[in-house]
Curated annotation (Swiss-Prot):
PROSITE patterns membership: IF_ROD_1 (PS00226), IF_ROD_2 (PS51842), LTD (PS51841)
Protein name (record): Intermediate filament protein A
Region feature (Tail): 343-497
Region: Linker 1, residue numbers: 33-46
Top-level taxon in the UniProt lineage: Eukaryota
Amino acid sequence: MSDLNDRLASYIEKVRFLEAQNRKLAADLDLLRGRWGKDTLSVRAMYEGELQEARKLVNDTNRQREELEKEIRKLLDELSEYRRKYEDALRGHQIDRDRIDELLNQLSGLEAEINLLRRRIANIIEEIARIKKENLQFANELTKARSDLDQETLNRIDFQNQVQTLLEEIDFMRRVHDQEIAELQAMASRDTTPENREYFKNELASAIRDIRAEYDQICNVNRMDMESWYKLKVQEIQTQSTRQNLEQNYAKKRLRVQLTDLRGKLADLEGRNSLLKQTQELNYQLEDDQRSYEAALNDRDAQIRKMDEECQALMMLLDTKQTLDAEIAIYRKMLEGEENRAGLRQLVEQVVKTHGLTQVDETESLRVLKGETASRTSFQRSAKGNVSIQETAPDGRYVVLENTHRSKEEAIGEWKLKRKIDGKREIVYTLPRDFILRPGKSVKIWARGQGGIHSPPEQLVFDLEDTFGSGSNVQTILFNREGEERATHIQRSSHTI
């Protein structure tokens, strides 16, 4: 940019120098009119250095233009690459969002399962508490049964002692009765009457039998009662102990099964908790990646905006350079025309003023002809979009339209090009339907019979008119389909003697 500005400043200085030279030459022209054609060779030699410098300047400008075009193409390629990467990043961002939604759904399902398992664990804990309570109750009953067993054992010992006491008492009573019987027998033996002895003996034997029978009956009854009661108590204790053992075994088995299930569920829950922690860590990492990604996108957007601004500045500079190239080309053609003629016919002075922000170009030229007439021509261009009127031939042979945008096509089908000559005559040309003007391209519209070839989209031929017209005040206006003015080109010429 600085180099181009330096070159532009140098060019402006050169133009000013040429202005001074032209003024000097204009003063010398009056002297040359009287002796026209005498000093042609000397004048040509005098301007040969100027022509060489102009050619060198044109070559340098063309070379700089090619370098700028290469740089712009490189920037456009980089911009396309950044756009592609940006689109890839957007697609990756969408995939990450879908993955986050899927993980969130899985997390919701896992949280629901965890809540369900927590409720089941609470129910199992309540069941364990109930079983422990029942076990405590069974233990209390077992303790009571053992206490009853001990009491019954003590009762049995007491009854055995009572039996022993009764047996001893029976034995004592037997001895007493035997002694009484012996005494009665002794008394009976002292009885001398055989009938009395026999009678007492029989009575005594009968009494003894009755006593023995009664004693045996009492002993049998007591023994049977004791045995039945003892067997009943033992059976009850055994039955109760067996039932308690069965219940305890069943409770133990059920607790073992529940404990195994709880251990399995606990391991499952630990695995799920580990998975949840990993998911949470992945979410945190994903959020960090998203923040980094958004920061990178913001940086990239800032770089893209900066590149767009630089690209726009370069395009504005390129437009200015193209305008200068066009003016230099005109100047070169005029100078080359001087080389091809026999004498000095005309001197040309051009001053270019470009306003890139308003998209209005003004060009003013002064033409001094042989004889007594001087012609001054000024050009003014403006555009309200990407399509502008780049050039109009002063003799009305052609009109050039250009798309200044570097990447956007412009559909200008059925647009109208109106050309007004000196406020009187008006020529209207309608562009073909569905005509597309490509980015950075131009189309030259030739009048009929002016050497143009109809080869869209580079060249078109206006078959209805032989010329677009020429005059001292020519306005060329481009309208869109809706009749809105999109671009203008104004040419004003004045002649002085």
